[in-house]
Amino acid sequence: TGGASEIELNYGNQISHHFKSQVKNLVNQTSLKELTALIYKADFVICPDSGPAHIATAMKTKVIGLYAMSNPMRSGPYLSKNWVINHYPKAAKKLLNKEISELKWGYRIKKSEAMNLITPEEVIAKIDLLVLESY
């Protein structure tokens, strides 16, 4: 899911091209109501600190949360804390030269390169663990 911006559309296309099986790219193709229904039916959702993470938590759908720009202890999916990939402390140190204890509570790291600290391998490892635990 995502909006109509060029960057979101490009990300959706890039992600969907990496799969060997057929993937339906729904970037800019769902309403909020449709997105909520999709999340409700999903086994789990992978997303950053965003609306879908909060919708999934409300629907009791597991969330693999991708956090580097915000602190998941403040805004993370409280029902899926064990599935969060948390690089907020690493991003604070690398990009701001600060410990998270030095940052104001709720501070967002507004540098897009923070999310690059999360590797595909980490996400795949979380998916594998979640699937093993759930099935």
Residue ranges of each PLM-predicted region?
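Nucleotide-sugar donor-binding patch of glycosyltransferase catalytic domains
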Residues: 18, 25-26, 57-131
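Glycine-rich phosphate-binding loop signature in dinucleotide/nucleotide-binding domains
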Residues: 41, 130, 134
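Donor-binding and catalytic core of enzymes assembling or modifying cell-surface/extracellular glycoconjugates
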Residues: 1-72
